[in-house]
């Protein structure tokens, strides 16, 4: 099947999906309706581009016909030639774009995410840097019109982040932030350093797609839920009623504690969101590890401990080690203007996938 047959098949399926989503039987089946809605959304950009491409092809045909029929009208012929030139250039651009749009889609790209950031090697300095990363992602989310909600956080004595869990919601969140998982290294002079020496510290980032209950169901028998009194700074109990929730997935040992909300039910709901994402991610990682060759063709190796990026403060430099990208814009990037880095990662990933398909 050539590229045009593939595009026509995508358009035909898109139209079929539109009819299915109007079918009362489909609407009443929540799981199927969600699956078909996602499929329609994932193909919409491709179909729109293909329809625009077909219009460009028609414009080329019309311009060629106009040149033939100009009959000595120099002005009309010149106008038609200009239209032909522009349309041919547009045709080439659309063909390149459509090749990328036809690449196999990551089914999670349109999803919201659970974002986890932890201070790692480097003590207080690592925790402070984890706080810088949190601010960077919060500000980037603002530029994208996304909702950023801190679900759970733990700070240290100097105001750094030991661990933070956040939900980021909006359009195509996972597609842009999925490349952020890994170890982020910082090189700078800590505030407490009297000799002016540069120290190296690390914070880790984990990005997981949000998993709906209809997509991944956890057997309640596999969960142990403990209810306890939420504690504040210094360990004092801050609620007379036990509202904090500790949830453990027994088969994997994955644990979530939630006490940010004032009611037990809200803490339970948030804990369930996180544990569902973590358990699904745990098994997805096992499956990914079994497909080692495929994993190596994507950005990085998929290893969660892989050092993906270095932030060098003295030189105002950010280096992404996976794609060899270096930018002297550390201050700009940490202020949330991450597009240049993320766009480069997306482009690299798409190029790698195109090359793999052409082999």
Swiss-Prot record:
Q: Where in the cell is it found?
A: Cytoplasm
Q: One Pfam family this chain carries? A: PCRF
**Residue(s) carrying N5-methylglutamine:** 236
One GO cellular component term: cytoplasm
Q: Which SUPFAM superfamilies match?
A: Release factor
Transmembrane as a keyword? no
Which InterPro entries does the entry mention? PCRF, Pep_chain_release_fac_I, Pep_chain_release_fac_I_sf, Prokaryotic/Mito_RF, RF-1
Q: Does the keyword Nucleotide-binding apply?
A: no
Q: Which family does it belong to?
A: Belongs to the prokaryotic/mitochondrial release factor family.
Which NCBIfam families does the UniProt record give?
Answer: prfA, PRK00591.1
Q: What is this protein called in UniProt?
A: Peptide chain release factor 1
């Amino acid at each position: 099947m050539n590229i045009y047959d593939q595009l026509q098949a995508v358009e035909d399926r898109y139209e079929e999906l539109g009819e299915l989503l109007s079918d009362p039987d489909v609407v009443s089946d929540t799981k199927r309706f969600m699956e078909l809605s996602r499929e329609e959304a994932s193909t919409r950009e491709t179909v729109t581009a293909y329809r625009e491409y077909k219009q460009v092809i028609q414009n080329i045909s019309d311009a060629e016909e106009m040149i033939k029929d100009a009959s000595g009208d120099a002005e009309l012929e010149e106008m038609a030639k200009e239209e032909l030139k522009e349309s041919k250039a547009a045709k080439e651009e659309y063909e390149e774009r459509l090749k990328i749009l036809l690449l196999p889609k990551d089914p999670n790209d349109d999803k919201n995410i659970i974002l986890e950031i932890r201070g790692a090697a480097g003590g207080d300095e690592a925790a402070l840097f984890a706080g810088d990363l949190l601010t960077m992602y919060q500000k980037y989310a603002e530029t994208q019109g996304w909702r950023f909600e801190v679900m759970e956080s733990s700070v240290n004595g100097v105001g750094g982040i030991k661990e933070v869990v956040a939900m980021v919601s909006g359009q195509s969140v996972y597609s842009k932030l999925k490349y952020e998982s890994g170890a982020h290294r910082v090189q700078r002079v800590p505030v407490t350093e009297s000799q002016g020496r540069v120290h190296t510290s690390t914070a880790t980032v984990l990005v997981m797609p949000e998993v709906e209950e209809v997509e991944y169901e956890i057997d309640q028998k596999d969960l142990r839920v403990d209810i306890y009194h939420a504690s504040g700074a210094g360990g004092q109990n801050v609620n007379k009623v036990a509202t904090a929730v500790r949830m453990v997935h027994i088969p994997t040992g994955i644990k979530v504690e939630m006490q940010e909300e004032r009611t037990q039910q809200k803490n339970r709901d948030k804990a369930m969101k996180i544990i569902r994402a973590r358990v699904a991610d745990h098994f997805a990682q096992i499956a990914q590890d079994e497909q080692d060759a495929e994993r190596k063709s994507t950005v990085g190796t998929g290893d969660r401990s892989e050092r993906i990026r270095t932030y060098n403060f003295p030189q105002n430099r950010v280096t992404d080690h996976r794609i060899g990208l270096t930018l002297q814009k550390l201050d700009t990037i940490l202020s949330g203007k991450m597009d240049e880095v993320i766009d480069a990662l997306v482009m690299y990933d798409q190029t790698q996938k195109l090359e793999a398909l052409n082999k």
